[in-house]
């Protein structure tokens, strides 16, 4: 299974926090993404360009919001549920097997993958040979508009005995952005005020 493939339940349950940093280039500018999560259902993802925070997504237990260009948007409904789920350090540890649905084996680029529908708006895809999660497809309602995003994961490497993807490709519509990991830290203390 995926949990065993990336390190095993025992190792994963010892992780208290994850800080991930990655970078991408878009139209000549460098985009930096900093994601910080703890084991209390709190997570923050900041998107920075030239040192300035362009967008911020925060999950704080049972609430989630996005800040963009000075505007704060609270997430609701299924999008809120999905945000809370992915705020977990390793969401797969918490899956309710009665509520996920196996959809079949599909092609993801040049790989065969198991498609698992985990909610009304989100599916995960796991490589049939390695069991790594190689893709997610999610539909979000933002300000009345429905947006579908595809995230692909690759270049899996160990950090403290746990495998993490070190490349991530985010696609929304015709645009795709390739992010490369610049650092992953486990069990670093995260300032609780970030989630307010």
Protein language model regions, located:
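N-terminal mature ectodomain segment of secretory-pathway/periplasmic proteins
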Residues: 4-71, 100-101
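Gly/Pro-enriched, hydrophobic low-complexity segments
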Residues: 112-196
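Short, hydrophobic/aromatic-rich segments at coil-to-beta transitions
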Residues: 14-21, 39-46, 108-116, 132-135, ...
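Flexible, processing/modification-adjacent segments and terminal tails
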Residues: 60-122, 140-148, 194-196
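Short beta-strand segments
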Residues: 29-33, 55-57, 73, 122, ...
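Generic beta-strand structural signal
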Residues: 37-38, 58-59, 107, 126, ...
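Structural motif
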Residues: 26, 49, 68, 108-109, ...
């Amino acid at each position: 299974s995926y949990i065993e493939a990336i390190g095993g339940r025992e190792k994963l349950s010892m992780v208290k926090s994850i800080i991930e940093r990655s970078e991408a280039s878009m139209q000549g500018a460098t985009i930096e993404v900093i994601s910080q999560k703890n084991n209390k259902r709190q997570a923050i993802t900041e998107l920075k360009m030239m040192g300035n925070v362009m967008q911020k997504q925060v999950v704080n237990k049972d609430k989630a919001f996005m800040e963009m260009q000075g505007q704060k948007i609270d997430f609701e409904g299924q999008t809120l549920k999905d945000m809370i789920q992915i705020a977990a350090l390793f969401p797969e540890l918490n899956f309710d097997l009665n509520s996920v649905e196996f959809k079949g084996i599909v092609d993801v680029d040049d790989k065969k993958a198991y498609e698992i529908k985990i909610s009304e708006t989100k599916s995960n895809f796991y490589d049939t040979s390695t069991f790594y999660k190689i893709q997610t497809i999610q539909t979000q309602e933002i300000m009345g508009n429905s947006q579908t995003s595809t995230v692909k994961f690759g270049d899996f490497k160990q950090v403290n005995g746990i495998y993490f993807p070190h490349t991530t490709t985010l696609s929304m519509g015709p645009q795709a952005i390739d992010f490369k990991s610049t650092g992953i830290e486990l069990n670093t203390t995260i300032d609780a005020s970030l989630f307010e």
